[in-house]
């Protein structure tokens, strides 16, 4: 996505200031529908106070809304970022792919959202027509791992900055998959709960 420039009266009323556009650009590139402050800070690598001011301005302009679980991108924000909502766009290395029982996906996704795994810290999620993508990032922001849930498949992708060891992403993905397996194993023992952000995505 190109930097946002104010071109006309209507556009200038809609577009955020140039100093905020990089945040919206990353949100658009990641197709984020929801995220946490700390996750986005790691992704961007900027100071907490700077990000706090930017998010406050974007919230005031109705591009974002703050919730008890972090931030969600509003319809206005998705329009600005050009979020297609047509499906996950592959941009990483496939670390693992497996078939899953689709009827439990909503509950498992709910159990994963917001959790940390080894070096992975929760970043946020995106929604697609046939599922959801959950995203984690390391403390320094150099490794990102995405768990892509469709109706009957889980794909784990890794994105690694130059100079990072692929084995670290592989090890982190195995920790994540181990927890996912336990959630599926516990599916017959726990009452069903679906996180509000995953409702309407999976039919359970």
Regions found by a protein language model. Name each.
Residues 84-133:
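Short Lys/Arg-enriched alpha/beta "domain-start" segment
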Residues 119-204:
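Charged, low-complexity intrinsically disordered regulatory/assembly segments
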Residues 1-25:
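Short alpha-helical segments that sit at the start of domains
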Residues 59-69:
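A short, conserved structural fragment
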Residues 27, 40, 51-61:
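Basic amphipathic alpha-helical segments that dock to polyanions
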Residues 68-82:
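Accessory beta->alpha helical hairpin/"wing" motif in late/C-terminal subdomains of nucleic-acid enzymes
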Residues 32-43:
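Short acidic, hydrophobic short linear motifs in intrinsically disordered regions
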